[in-house]
Amino acid sequence: MGRTSPARTGRQRRYVGRMMTVLVNGLPGAGKSTLARALAAELGLPLFGKDAVKETLADRLAPLCPADRWEWSRLLGAAAGETLWTLLRDARGAAVLEAPWLGDPLRRIVRAELDSAGVGVPQEVWCDVPVALARRRFEERVPHRHPVHPERPGEPDPRWDAWALTAGPLVLGPVHRVDTTGPVDVPALAAALRAAVRAAAAHPGDTDETREVSFRSQ
C-alpha cells in the first residue's frame, strides 16, 4: 500500500476543517423544513430533507403499499433516513440535513452515520418552540400532508407525550438553539454557523460536544 504524502494529508485535513454539516432538528411542527430551506440557500449548500425523500419514494412505490399505513410509513421513513446519509457521503460532508432526530437511541445511529461520512463535528440547529405550539402547528397541517404520513385528523398520537418529556438536541457538536416561534434572521444564523466551523477548524483538538448557543431573532 502506498504512503500518503504529508502535502496530501494536509489538504485532506484542511478540507475536513472547511466542510460544514448542518443538522436541522426539532419536533414536528417546529419549523424545520422552512428554516432548512432558507438556511441551505443562504449557505450555498445542498439540502437533504427526510420528508422530501420519503414522499418521493412513496409516489414511486405506491403499488407496493401494504394495508398497514403505519408500517408503510416506518419502512419508507427508514429508507429515507438511509438515503440522507448516502447523499451526505456523496456531498463529502457539505450539506444541510433536515429530519426529526428525537430520542436517545437515534444519537448513536446518527453519530455512526456521520463517522461513515467523514464528519467529525456537525453543527446542529435545534428549532426551539414550546411543545404545545409545535403540536398545534403539526395537527393543523395533518389534513394537507402527503398521504404517506400515517397521522389522521382527530386520531390520538401518544408520541407527543413522550416527546414532551424527552425531545432535545442530539448534542453531537455545537448546538444552535433557534427560536422558531416567529421569523428567523437567517443571514445572522448562517454567520454564526460559519464562525463555529472556523472555530472548530482552528481548534481541532477541542472535543467538547456540550456547547450550546441560544439564537434569538430580533
Residue map of PLM features:
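Hydrophobic anchor at the beta1->P-loop junction of P-loop NTPases
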Residues: 24
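Conserved phosphate-donor/acceptor-positioning beta-strand/loop module used by diverse small-molecule
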Residues: 117-139
